[in-house]
Amino acid sequence: MKSYVEIVDVMARQILDSRANPTVEVEVVLEDGTVGRASVPSGASTGQFEAVELRDNDKAQYLGKSVLNAVDNVNETIATELIGMNVFDQTLIDQTMLEIDGTENKSKLGANAMLGVSLAVARAAAEYLGISLYQYLGGVNAKVLPVPMMNIVNGGKHADNNVDFQEFMIMPAGAPSFSEALRSCAEVYHTLKSLLQSKGLETAVGDEGGFAPNLNSNEEAIQIILEAVTKAGYEPGKDMFIAMDPASTEFYENGKYNLKGEGKVYTSEEMVEVYANLVEKYPIISLEDGMAEEDWDGWKLLTDRIGDKVQLVGDDLFVTNTKRLSKGIQLGVANSILIKLNQIGTLTETLNAIEMAQRAGYTAVVSHRSGETEDTTISDLVVAVNAGQIKTGAPARTERVAKYNQLLRIEEELGEVAEFRGLNAFYNIKK
């Protein structure tokens, strides 16, 4: 097997994501004709510190959302530099793109252009070797199947309803295996749908496959999910746990948390107490973006108050960025990071963020975006780094289900070696 395999072509095209918005797809071709292909997701609630997703802003095309400039950046600028390079030099390839871009936030080439190339390179390398992507990225030690964090009720930016918190999720941490975890989630999802129908509530699905019923409060969303869990034959707090993503930056105004759906405005201290009370009352195991991305003091209060018993995930807070994560670790803020490839824009930087988190005793939760494609890289990535948790939507809508189906294939391929850690995936909290 050759150790230097030349990249002979790099090409990008514009395709559509799951929200009918254009996104970037890249193909990397090797000297023997092997092709690696990857496409890039896009978020709805984006943190201000995320790497730049380059869009054309040409109102005559896709309402300004086209990505032809990013495509050109791949086909003209990046391709020229990468052709002739060794496909196995992932770090050098990513470094080369960072140097060509030269900006702090990837605003010249676009994180969407760079990520498409970065992932397609890794895919091409795995294809050439005839191994799965998770094996290529993680080696023989890649064996942990993740606990799903499934978004089944939506509010906030992901829905047109009275619920302020953006996502209410279930986590089947009591399941014995990934496939059983997936089954239990699907059963709860169907049961929830019937339950909503019986109450005369809306069952149309949102961007990530979750339901967006018009409930009276955030607490009602938790209650209705727990009712569905019990009805489906599972025990809350033993088989199935609740995870929430309030996405609080979205309702943080002038230093206060403005919950419009509930008609309440809270200080950081009061908001922490709202969460502490919910955690006391319900089997909540994970809370993402409980405080706003710039409310470091609020985050510290939250971590000190409930950080020993609940996973506190930084998404907008950390944006998969080692500089921001490093600050969080030093301040003792949060105990987990959400990993979104397109927040940072290269595979190398993503792996660095995961490694930094794990070394500090933080968990890493690998995540989709609300605008997705059929690309399943995150399924391989989560197993490659043994992260133990994945957030990739409801068990509905093919761009979500594709990720779960890929994990079923990986579980099957690993066979006896496959591990499902369940509650032990939460090594950052006391159980």
Curated annotation (Swiss-Prot):
Residues where Mg(2+) binds: 245, 288, 315
Main location: cytoplasm
CC cofactor note: Binds a second Mg(2+) ion via substrate during catalysis.
The protein's annotated pathway: Carbohydrate degradation; glycolysis; pyruvate from D-glyceraldehyde 3-phosphate: step 4/5
SMART domains from the UniProt entry: Enolase_C (SM01192), Enolase_N (SM01193)
Keyword list, A-Z: Cytoplasm, Glycolysis, Lyase, Magnesium, Metal-binding, Secreted
Keyword Transmembrane: no
Signal peptide: none
InterPro entries in UniProt: Enolase (IPR000941), Enolase-like_C_sf (IPR036849), Enolase-like_N (IPR029017), Enolase_C (IPR020810), Enolase_CS (IPR020809), Enolase_N (IPR020811)
Catalytic function, reaction form: (2R)-2-phosphoglycerate = phosphoenolpyruvate + H2O
The EC number(s) this enzyme carries: 4.2.1.11
Cofactor(s) annotated in UniProt: Mg(2+)
HAMAP family: Enolase
Family: Belongs to the enolase family.
Protein name: Enolase
Organism: Clostridium acetobutylicum (strain ATCC 824 / DSM 792 / JCM 1419 / IAM 19013 / LMG 5710 / NBRC 13948 / NRRL B-527 / VKM B-1787 / 2291 / W)
